[in-house]
Swiss-Prot record:
Belongs to the universal ribosomal protein uS12 family. Part of the 30S ribosomal subunit. CDD domains: Ribosomal_S23. One of its GO terms (biological process) is translation. Signal peptide: none annotated. SUPFAM superfamilies: Nucleic acid-binding proteins. Keywords: Ribonucleoprotein, Ribosomal protein, RNA-binding, rRNA-binding. This is Small ribosomal subunit protein uS12. With S4 and S5 plays an important role in translational accuracy. Located at the interface of the 30S and 50S subunits. GO terms for molecular function: rRNA binding; structural constituent of ribosome. The keyword RNA-binding applies. Pfam families: Ribosom_S12_S23 (PF00164). The gene is rps12. GO terms for cellular component: small ribosomal subunit.
Protein backbone atom coordinates (compact mmCIF):
# COMPACT_ATOMS: atom_id res chain seq x y z
CA UNK A 1 0.00 0.00 0.00
CA UNK A 2 1.67 3.17 -1.15
CA UNK A 3 1.49 6.12 1.16
CA UNK A 4 4.18 8.31 -0.36
CA UNK A 5 4.01 11.77 -1.83
CA UNK A 6 2.76 10.66 -5.26
CA UNK A 7 0.62 7.68 -4.20
CA UNK A 8 -2.79 9.40 -4.48
CA UNK A 9 -3.67 7.81 -7.83
CA UNK A 10 -2.98 4.29 -6.55
CA UNK A 11 -4.81 4.96 -3.29
CA UNK A 12 -7.84 6.21 -5.17
CA UNK A 13 -7.81 3.30 -7.62
CA UNK A 14 -7.47 0.74 -4.81
CA UNK A 15 -10.32 2.36 -2.88
CA UNK A 16 -12.56 2.26 -5.96
CA UNK A 17 -11.72 -1.40 -6.59
CA UNK A 18 -12.35 -2.35 -2.97
CA UNK A 19 -15.79 -0.70 -2.98
CA UNK A 20 -17.06 -3.70 -4.91
CA UNK A 21 -16.55 -5.85 -1.80
CA UNK A 22 -19.28 -3.80 -0.11
CA UNK A 23 -22.49 -5.71 -0.85
CA UNK A 24 -24.69 -2.63 -0.72
CA UNK A 25 -22.49 -0.74 -3.19
CA UNK A 26 -22.37 -3.64 -5.65
CA UNK A 27 -26.16 -4.17 -5.54
CA UNK A 28 -26.76 -0.44 -6.04
CA UNK A 29 -24.38 -0.15 -8.99
CA UNK A 30 -25.72 -3.25 -10.74
CA UNK A 31 -29.34 -2.25 -10.01
CA UNK A 32 -30.14 -5.68 -8.59
CA UNK A 33 -32.80 -4.51 -6.12
CA UNK A 34 -34.60 -2.48 -8.79
CA UNK A 35 -34.51 -5.45 -11.18
CA UNK A 36 -36.00 -7.77 -8.56
CA UNK A 37 -38.63 -5.26 -7.37
CA UNK A 38 -42.06 -5.90 -8.96
CA UNK A 39 -42.73 -2.14 -8.93
CA UNK A 40 -39.35 -1.56 -10.65
CA UNK A 41 -38.28 1.08 -8.14
CA UNK A 42 -41.53 3.07 -8.26
CA UNK A 43 -43.22 4.10 -4.97
CA UNK A 44 -46.68 2.88 -6.05
CA UNK A 45 -48.18 0.75 -8.76
CA UNK A 46 -51.58 -0.07 -10.22
CA UNK A 47 -52.92 -3.53 -10.84
CA UNK A 48 -55.97 -5.70 -11.36
CA UNK A 49 -57.27 -7.93 -8.54
CA UNK A 50 -57.12 -11.60 -9.53
CA UNK A 51 -58.44 -13.19 -6.33
CA UNK A 52 -58.88 -12.70 -2.61
CA UNK A 53 -56.62 -14.82 -0.42
CA UNK A 54 -56.33 -15.42 3.30
CA UNK A 55 -52.76 -15.57 4.60
CA UNK A 56 -52.16 -17.27 7.94
CA UNK A 57 -50.26 -15.18 10.48
CA UNK A 58 -46.94 -16.49 11.77
CA UNK A 59 -46.55 -17.87 15.30
CA UNK A 60 -47.29 -16.92 18.08
CA UNK A 61 -50.22 -15.07 16.45
CA UNK A 62 -53.26 -16.85 15.13
CA UNK A 63 -55.28 -15.09 12.43
CA UNK A 64 -56.09 -15.10 8.76
CA UNK A 65 -54.86 -11.86 7.23
CA UNK A 66 -57.04 -10.75 4.34
CA UNK A 67 -54.99 -10.17 1.20
CA UNK A 68 -55.49 -9.96 -2.55
CA UNK A 69 -53.48 -11.28 -5.48
CA UNK A 70 -52.80 -8.42 -7.87
CA UNK A 71 -51.46 -8.45 -11.42
CA UNK A 72 -49.52 -5.26 -12.09
CA UNK A 73 -50.46 -3.32 -15.20
CA UNK A 74 -46.95 -2.08 -16.03
CA UNK A 75 -45.24 -5.47 -16.28
CA UNK A 76 -47.78 -8.24 -15.68
CA UNK A 77 -46.10 -9.50 -12.51
CA UNK A 78 -48.29 -10.95 -9.78
CA UNK A 79 -47.92 -9.87 -6.15
CA UNK A 80 -49.85 -10.31 -2.90
CA UNK A 81 -51.09 -7.13 -1.20
CA UNK A 82 -52.57 -6.76 2.29
CA UNK A 83 -55.98 -5.09 2.72
CA UNK A 84 -55.56 -2.87 5.80
CA UNK A 85 -58.52 -2.20 8.08
CA UNK A 86 -61.50 -3.93 9.66
CA UNK A 87 -63.73 -5.18 6.82
CA UNK A 88 -61.52 -3.64 4.14
CA UNK A 89 -61.57 -6.83 2.08
CA UNK A 90 -65.34 -6.36 1.55
CA UNK A 91 -64.67 -3.22 -0.50
CA UNK A 92 -62.40 -5.10 -2.91
CA UNK A 93 -63.82 -7.34 -5.62
CA UNK A 94 -62.16 -9.38 -8.35
CA UNK A 95 -61.25 -7.37 -11.47
CA UNK A 96 -61.15 -4.11 -9.48
CA UNK A 97 -58.28 -1.76 -10.23
CA UNK A 98 -56.21 -1.19 -7.10
CA UNK A 99 -53.19 0.93 -6.24
CA UNK A 100 -50.54 -0.71 -4.08
CA UNK A 101 -47.43 0.47 -2.28
CA UNK A 102 -44.72 -1.13 -0.16
CA UNK A 103 -45.77 -2.40 3.26
CA UNK A 104 -42.78 -0.74 4.93
CA UNK A 105 -40.82 -3.74 6.19
CA UNK A 106 -37.07 -3.52 6.49
CA UNK A 107 -35.06 -3.79 3.28
CA UNK A 108 -38.32 -3.72 1.30
CA UNK A 109 -39.40 -7.06 2.73
CA UNK A 110 -42.57 -8.18 4.51
CA UNK A 111 -43.60 -6.77 7.88
CA UNK A 112 -44.94 -8.20 11.12
CA UNK A 113 -46.66 -11.57 11.12
CA UNK A 114 -47.71 -11.63 7.45
CA UNK A 115 -45.24 -13.91 5.64
CA UNK A 116 -44.44 -13.18 2.00
CA UNK A 117 -46.66 -10.10 1.70
CA UNK A 118 -44.67 -7.00 0.75
CA UNK A 119 -47.41 -4.62 -0.40
CA UNK A 120 -50.55 -2.91 0.90
CA UNK A 121 -53.65 -1.78 -0.99
CA UNK A 122 -54.12 2.01 -0.77
CA UNK A 123 -56.84 2.70 -3.35
CA UNK A 124 -59.65 0.76 -4.99
CA UNK A 125 -60.96 2.17 -8.29
CA UNK A 126 -59.19 5.47 -7.50
CA UNK A 127 -60.88 5.88 -4.09
CA UNK A 128 -58.87 5.62 -0.87
CA UNK A 129 -59.45 2.29 0.90
CA UNK A 130 -59.05 3.97 4.30
CA UNK A 131 -61.83 6.47 3.47
CA UNK A 132 -64.15 3.61 2.50
CA UNK A 133 -63.36 1.65 5.68
CA UNK A 134 -64.05 4.68 7.89
CA UNK A 135 -67.30 5.31 5.98
CA UNK A 136 -66.43 8.72 4.55
CA UNK A 137 -66.60 7.61 0.93
CA UNK A 138 -68.49 5.01 -1.05
CA UNK A 139 -67.00 2.66 -3.56
CA UNK A 140 -67.89 3.89 -7.06
CA UNK A 141 -70.06 1.65 -9.21
CA UNK A 142 -68.34 0.87 -12.49
Amino acid sequence: MGNGKFAARKLKRDANNNRWHDTGYARRQLGLDVKADPLEGAPQGRGIVLEKVGVEAKQPNSAIRKCVRVQLIKNGRQVTAFAVGDGAINFIDEHDEVEIEGIGGRLGRSKGDIPGVRFVVTKVNNVSLREMVTGRKEKPRR
